[in-house]
Curated annotation (Swiss-Prot):
It comes from the Bacteria. Homodimer. Pfam families: Adenylsucc_synt (PF00709). PROSITE patterns: ADENYLOSUCCIN_SYN_1, ADENYLOSUCCIN_SYN_2. The active site is at residues 15, 43. Pathway: Purine metabolism; AMP biosynthesis via de novo pathway; AMP from IMP: step 1/2. GO terms for cellular component: cytoplasm. Substrate binds at residues 301-307. This is Adenylosuccinate synthetase. Keywords: Cytoplasm, GTP-binding, Ligase, Magnesium, Metal-binding, Nucleotide-binding, Purine biosynthesis. IMP binds at residues 15-18, 40-43, 131, 145, 226, 241, 305. One of its GO terms (biological process) is IMP metabolic process. It comes from Thiobacillus denitrificans (strain ATCC 25259 / T1). Binds 1 Mg(2+) ion per subunit. The gene is purA.
Length: 432
């Protein structure tokens, strides 16, 4: 049978529940690929009631026979990776023999973290709300063609020469502009070299490995981090992350051609959340917003920050569906809406008195939009753990069907709880 590749993408501002869905889909995949972002992602998996949070290693690591890949589009913090490996291996998960890392990954280093944190402090109230982990500065170095890549780590003299140049540049900024302490060359060099030996066995030609896996009939799963509305090009710029979190990023960030992406699964919550700064048209500041946050346990897996909550935004989802070429939707956290008398859906916006049915481009265009709502009846029966669509409360079914009508894409999967088994499958992505 020919191999099939599925891309999992967040369609909102991240935190849509991708980790659980990737973990569930790995049942059908022989390889799972991270293709963008860094250890700013927080993917929470619950298996048999046991909770694991992964930041860098693909969620497929919890399945014994799955090979995990970190593609060239990921910025790699070696210390964070080794810490995560140690945590998993202490829990009995074999990582080292099942993880392949692209030699082209740019490295996140101490000067990137120092810059990230100094900038956020300097911006004060105008801050973007980064995780302070050096992600943005590492991507900047990549684009400026001065990044140190994983392959450089195994050549001490080459690494030292490049590091000297890069530190001259960044330390000048840290000292003279941000007025903070500079980063030590010797400490950085010794620290990075100390990690090289453990990393070396996992370094691979990832594009070739993925090509060979497909050729041998293996299904691949591409695991997106963050969400479409945080994409550097298509998100609510400048309140965005520094990578392409859209389906197109799966191709560039892994070295697998776009024609090999056979199905794109867009993950969306049954409501909307956002972490950090930036426009959010359907944000709620009332008791309902509080209720969604508490019932949905809306605290970031990476930062612990409380997420902002609001109604489901079909106009924003429509933008994500078009950008990603979404084949089908997976709706998560439906149970959080259980018990609400009325459920509101944003179907468009008023902008300067004119109606618009799709999210405008860029933060400035979105800041003053007025959402246009459609009210749907809520349901009182629980949806928790339901595994058949027709066993959902009738009004919950109506809500999901309305979502399909508004977005013109089928709801193929519904998540009704954090565990793998709490899933309704209407059309399986690997069978679609």
């Amino acid at each position: 049978m020919a191999a099939k590749n599925v891309v999992v993408i967040g369609t909102q501002w991240g935190d849509e529940g991708k980790g659980k869905i990737v973990d569930w889909l790995t049942d059908r995949a022989q390889g799972v690929v991270r293709f963008q972002g860094g250890h700013n992602a927080g993917h929470t998996l619950v298996v048999g009631g046991k909770k694991t949070v992964l930041h860098l290693i693909p969620s497929g690591i919890l399945r014994d026979n799955v090979t995990c890949y970190i593609g060239n589009g990921v910025v790699l913090a070696p210390d964070a990776l080794l810490k995560e490996m140690d945590m998993l291996e202490a829990a009995g998960v074999d990582v080292a023999s099942r993880l392949k890392i692209s030699e082209a990954c740019p490295l996140i280093m101490p000067h990137h973290v120092a810059l990230d944190q100094a900038r956020e402090i300097a911006k004060g109230a105008g801050k973007i709300g980064t995780t302070g982990r050096g992600i943005g500065p590492a991507y900047e170095d990549k684009v400026a063609r001065r990044a140190l890549r994983l392959q450089d780590l195994f050549h001490r003299e080459r690494f030292a020469a490049k590091l000297g140049e890069v530190l001259d540049h960044h330390n000048f900024m840290l000292k003279n502009y941000y007025k903070v302490e500079v980063v030590s060359f010797n400490q950085t060099l010794d620290g990075m070299m100390a990690m090289a030996e453990r990393l070396k066995p996992m370094v691979a030609d990832v594009p070739r490995s993925l090509y060979e896996a497909n050729k041998a009939g293996g299904n691949l799963l591409f695991e997106g981090a963050q969400g479409t509305l945080l994409d550097i090009d298509h998100g609510t710029y400048p309140f965005v992350t520094s990578s392409n979190c859209t389906a197109g990023g799966a191709a560039t960030g892994s070295g697998v051609g776009p024609s090999a992406m056979h199905y794109v699964l867009g993950i969306t919550k049954a409501y909307t959340t956002r972490v950090g700064s930036g426009p959010f048209p359907t944000e709620l500041f009332d008791d309902v917003g509080q209720y969604l946050g508490e019932k949905g346990h809306e605290f970031g897996a990476t930062t612990g920050r409380q997420r902002r909550c609001g109604w489901f935004d079909a106009a924003a989802l429509k933008r994500s569906i078009q950008i990603n070429g979404v084949s089908g939707l997976c709706v998560t956290k439906l149970d959080v809406l259980d018990g609400l008398e009325t459920v509101r859906v944003c179907v468009g916006y008023k902008i300067d008195g004119e109606a618009c049915d799709i999210l405008p481009v860029g933060a400035e265009s979105i800041t003053n939009v007025e959402p246009i709502y459609e009210d749907l009846p809520g349901w009182s029966d629980t949806t928790v753990g339901v595994q058949m669509f027709d066993k959902l409360p009738q009004k919950a079914q109506t809500y999901l069907k309305r979502m399909e009508e508004l977005c013109e894409v089928p709801v193929d999967v519904v998540s009704t709880g954090p565990d793998r088994v709490e899933t309704i499958v209407r059309r399986h992505p690997y069978e679609a």
